[in-house]
From Swiss-Prot:
Protein name: Oxidoreductase iacF
Pathway(s) per entry: Secondary metabolite biosynthesis
Keywords: Oxidoreductase
Gene: iacF
Similarity remark: Belongs to the oxidoreductase OpS7 family.
Superkingdom of source: Eukaryota
MF (Gene Ontology): oxidoreductase activity
Disulfide bond entries: none
Induction conditions: Expression is co-regulated with the other genes from the iso-A82775C biosynthesis cluster and probably controlled by the cluster-specific transcription factors iacI and iacK.
Summary of the protein's practical applications: Iso-A82775C is a precursor for the biosynthesis of the anticancer natural products chloropestolides A to E via a Diesls-Alder reaction with maldoxin. In the absence of the prenyltransferase iacE, siccayne accumulates instead of iso-A82775C and can also be condensed with maldoxin to produce chloropestolides H to K, which show also antibacterial and anticancer properties.
Key word Cytoplasm present: no
Entry function: Oxidoreductase; part of the gene cluster that mediates the biosynthesis of iso-A82775C, a enylepoxycyclohexane and biosynthetic precursor of the chloropestolide anticancer natural products. Within the cluster, the prenyltransferase iacE prenylates siccayne to generate pestalodiol E, using dimethylallyl diphosphate (DMAPP) as cosubstrate. The probable oxidoreductase iacF is then involved in the epoxidation of pestalodiol F to pestalodiol F, which is further converted to pestalofone A by the short-chain dehydrogenase/reductase iacG.
InterPro entries documented for this protein: RmlC-like_jellyroll, RmlC_Cupin_sf
Gene inactivation effect: Abolishes the production of iso-A82775C, but accumulates pestalodiol E.
Length: 204
């Protein structure tokens, strides 16, 4: 049972979309398509397609907020269009002619469809390590996050910061919103863990 004060502090959709059985799944308003794929060695990667006809894609709003991963390196390879990215405060625009973008663990970063692109953005992304570890960025995290955001959007709700922090915490990742991004990493981790504990223990 969800109490009124929990709903007030952390609004949640009344209906949750089940996307675990879907081979591929869409984000809010079908702005982007996630296609989980497998490598010959059994590791996974994701092909993301961000559709330029969607106004949120043209505005560069379909990427994640600034964040970092504590246990994994992350990699991006563009197949079509232009990917914008920030890596430790340095902004770049990447095309298929550029090498793989490597984001070492602990690096603050974000990515989005770059406004200079004139076509759909298509890129692949993967993390290392990507299996045999608990509490890492994996396909369950991507499905849960995409489904939650889409459900919030369909019901006209603002996503709960506490829920987002808990999602990232369970994937050994840290959100870096502006009011926290000034912190050194050790303090940011401490605050993030505290907020995730509140979300898990008190907000249901």
């Amino acid at each position: 049972m969800v109490w009124a004060w929990q709903q007030w502090l952390s609004p949640r959709p009344q209906k949750r979309t089940k996307n675990t059985s879907q081979v591929a799944f869409y984000t809010s308003e079908n702005a982007a398509l996630y296609e989980p794929l497998s490598k010959p060695d059994g590791n996974w990667y994701v092909r993301e397609t961000h559709f330029r006809e969607n106004p949120n894609v043209r505005a560069g709003l379909t990427g994640p907020p600034l964040h970092l991963h504590l246990q994994q390196d992350e990699y991006f390879k563009v197949e079509q269009g232009v990917l914008g990215a920030v890596k430790d405060g340095v902004e770049v625009a990447i095309t298929k002619n550029d090498p793989v973008l490597h984001i070492p663990r602990g690096t603050r970063h974000r990515f989005w469809p770059h406004p200079s692109s004139t076509e759909d953005l298509v890129f692949t992304a993967w993390a290392d390590p990507c299996k045999d570890h608990d509490h890492i960025l994996d396909l369950n995290f991507l499905r849960n996050l995409a489904g939650y955001l889409a459900d919030c959007d369909s019901e006209g709700l603002q996503p709960s910061p506490f829920q987002l922090i808990l999602f990232f915490h369970e994937a050994s990742s840290i959100l870096c919103p502006p009011f926290l991004n000034w912190m050194p990493l050790w303090l940011l981790i401490w605050v993030h863990n505290g907020l995730a504990w509140i979300a898990r223990e008190f907000l249901g």
